Each structure stands twice: as structure tokens, then as C-alpha cells.
From Swiss-Prot:
Coiled coil: none annotated. HAMAP family: UPF0235. Pfam families: DUF167. This is UPF0235 protein MA_4097. InterPro entries: DUF167 (IPR003746), YggU-like_sf (IPR036591). NCBIfam families: DUF167 family protein (TIGR00251). It comes from the Archaea. It comes from Methanosarcina acetivorans (strain ATCC 35395 / DSM 2834 / JCM 12185 / C2A). Belongs to the UPF0235 family.
Length: 109
């Protein structure tokens, strides 16, 4: 079950930027960034059309988030989970409040 009430729990603030906890579904029919919120895992759900081979899904994830937040893809790093569906991303160049605002607007669509 997906809910959008507490998606802020997936976002944390650090001195170097923000961390967003993400759960990726690669090889989906359509690209959906974000596609929902998993309240049990406290992760923003994302659907990617690229398969998880040779970093293609990670590349698509970073490019999609950069476009969503209006920042350079070089400001997004996979902090942990590069080879997992559960990823922790370090994002520079946006504040916690900007992330909540942008993701919240997309999740309510």
C-alpha cells in the first residue's frame, strides 16, 4: 500500500546536502519519478524504464532526479545501494524544503 502522508521520513539533512532514501523498480513500462512512497520501508518509490545492467538504471535515476530538481546530475551521488534496489542518494544544490516541496507536488498528482 502506498501513501503520501509521511514521505518526508525518506529525506534527511546533512551538512553536505540532503539524503533521499529511494526504492527503485528497474525495467518498468513507464518512467515515474517519484511513483509513490513506501511507508514501511520509509523510501520514495521510483519506476525506471532502463534495466539494472551496466549502471543504466542508476544513470536514468540520477538524470531523472536532476531534471526533477533542476540541478546538474553531478550534484547527485549514490551514497549506498549502487547495486541494490534500495538506494540512498546524496543530493547537493537543493535544500530539504525544496526536496519536500518538489516531491510532495509530484506525489499528489
Amino acid at each position: 500500500m502506498m501513501t503520501y502522508m509521511s514521505f518526508e521520513e525518506a529525506i534527511k539533512t546533512l551538512d553536505s546536502g540532503i539524503i533521499i532514501e529511494i526504492e527503485v523498480t528497474p525495467g518498468s513500462r513507464s518512467l515515474s519519478v517519484p511513483s509513490g512512497y513506501n511507508e514501511w520501508r520509509k523510501r520514495i518509490a521510483v519506476k525506471l524504464t532502463k534495466n539494472a545492467q551496466k549502471g543504466k538504471a542508476n544513470e536514468q535515476l540520477i538524470e531523472s532526479l536532476a531534471e526533477l530538481f533542476g540541478i546538474s546530475s553531478s550534484e547527485i551521488l549514490i551514497n549506498s545501494g549502487a547495486t541494490s534496489s534500495k538506494k540512498s542518494l546524496l543530493i547537493k544544490g537543493i535544500s530539504y524544503q525544496q526536496a519536500v516541496s518538489v516531491l510532495g507536488a509530484r506525489l499528489k498528482e
